Regions:
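Alpha-helical transmembrane segments of multi-pass small-molecule/ion transporters
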Residues: 1-302
Length: 302
């Protein structure tokens, strides 16, 4: 059964991404971005953190810890993908700047058609086999087909059938999460991922990566003078990543080699662990405390 389930990855992986992106699009309207247009600095900073700082952290960890090729590429792949719709929901619960969260998610998702191949080409080159050519065109086509088209379809639904969009979004995201659970079950049960054999280092590295984002980004945002609601939005956005995109691209790396399982394991483990990286700041700010550890509150005036 597990082997049959694992063999369905070629269908389940793109399907879960289509559902997730359609569900995210069904929550969005152009009005969500009006406040961001008036003050684009928060969006610009969030994108720099997402596209530049997060991959740099992954590169630093991979080099400092001497990660093997598959583990390094897996970590860099997770670092290259944008934030996901779940980050917007957690930002809402944490009383963060929801329009900013949605804006970073949307712009980074639209931009990932260029940024994901670029980050992988620049950062992962030294970890890939000699002669490996990154299939940039195929990556762009798959991102366009499985991310941008469903996202646009969801936004069109919200525009012309707002009464149905909430239910579509809710069930689409639930369906996407259920499919990720099935993908994980198939990978574990079929032996594609051997947790005991892989040992303790891979999950520890992933936890260090996620915890570094959760602890470091708030300090960076405070140092740059951002209010707490912006800090919550940006931190959750970079901590909770759209791992569905990473799962979509796993098959490009180390086909038929053991290292591909390392890439898959990294993506699936981060998908399961990432909410834990976002919960502390969500609860702290949601309960009226400072979004930044060991610092005073900095609420937005008015």
């Amino acid at each position: 059964m597990f082997h049959a389930l694992a063999s369905l990855d070629v269908v389940l992986v793109p399907l879960q991404l289509v559902l997730a992106m359609a569900g995210m699009g069904a929550t969005m309207t152009l009005a969500d971005f009006k406040s961001i247009v008036r003050d684009p600095s928060g969006l610009a900073l969030g994108l720099v953190v997402q596209v530049v700082c997060v991959p740099l952290l992954a590169v630093g960890l991979a080099q400092a810890l001497g990660l093997g090729k598959g583990w390094a590429v897996g970590l860099l792949l997770v670092a290259a993908v944008p934030g996901g719709a779940f980050s917007n929901l957690l930002t809402f619960f944490g009383r963060g700047n929801v329009p900013l969260s949605i804006a970073i998610t949307t712009v980074s998702t639209l931009g990932c058609i260029a940024t994901v191949p670029l980050v992988l080409r620049v950062a992962a080159r030294s970890h890939l086999p000699p002669g490996f050519v990154l299939p940039t065109q195929r990556i762009v086509v798959e991102i366009f087909a499985y991310l941008l088209i469903p996202l646009a379809a969801g936004m069109v639904l919200r525009r012309f059938a707002p009464g149905r969009s909430a239910a579509v979004s809710r069930w689409s995201i639930r369906g996407a999460l259920s499919l990720i659970a099935l993908i994980t079950l198939g990978a574990l049960g079929s032996g594609k991922i051997r947790v005991v054999e892989f040992g303790w280092q891979p999950p520890l590295v992933i936890v260090v990566f996620g915890a570094s984002l959760a602890l470091g980004v708030p300090q960076l945002m405070r140092a740059l003078g951002r209010y707490d609601d912006d800090t919550v939005a940006t931190t959750i956005e970079v901590a909770v990543r759209n791992v569905g995109v990473a799962l979509l691209l796993v098959h490009f790396f180390f086909p038929g080699q053991p290292e591909q399982a390392h890439v898959l394991y990294t993506a699936l483990f981060y998908a399961g662990a990432s909410p834990a990286f976002a919960l502390p700041i969500m609860f702290r700010h949601g309960w009226g405390r400072s979004a930044v550890l060991f610092r005073r509150r900095r609420p937005r005036p008015g």
